[in-house]
């Protein structure tokens, strides 16, 4: 799903998305608790909001804030047997670590925020760190 709203930021869009999913679940199923396969998802609780860097740190125990540059990121990828292309920069490699180590763990509703600029070059940069952008994905 993709949606836009004027006069808000990405935090406001996350709020809107969270409320929309909660409302739809309640209207369609009569509950904010959903079962999918062997998993139960609880939409009644606040959805987790985590940065991509923090998610990789949580599930891969690697802090990309401590990775100084692209060369170090590529070395780290090699050590973890993560394939990358020569053109990839540090942010691209962060995204590869996210795909390898994090995605499978995101069962409960989660917003992954603050993606690297390399994978979202047209998105508004974070004022406090232009290496990241004000973007989120809902899992």
Predicted regions and their residues:
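Short, glycine/acidic-rich hinge or "gate" loops at secondary-structure transitions
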Residues: 28-40
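A translation/RNA-centric and nucleic-acid-associated enzymatic feature enriched
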Residues: 1-25, 41, 46-139
């Amino acid at each position: 799903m993709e949606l836009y709203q004027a006069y808000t930021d990405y935090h406001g869009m996350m709020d809107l998305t969270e409320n929309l999913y909660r409302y739809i679940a309640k209207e369609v199923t009569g509950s904010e608790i959903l079962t999918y396969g062997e998993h139960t998802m609880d939409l009644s609780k606040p959805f987790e909001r985590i940065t991509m860097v923090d998610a990789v740190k949580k599930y891969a125990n690697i802090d990309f804030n401590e990775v100084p540059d692209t060369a170090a990121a590529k070395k780290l990828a090699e050590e973890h047997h993560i394939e990358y292309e020569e053109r990839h920069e540090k942010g691209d490699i962060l995204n590869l670590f996210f795909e390898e180590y994090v995605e499978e763990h995101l069962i409960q509703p989660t917003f992954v925020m603050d993606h690297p600029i390399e994978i979202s070059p047209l998105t508004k940069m974070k004022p406090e760190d232009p290496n990241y952008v004000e973007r989120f994905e809902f899992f």
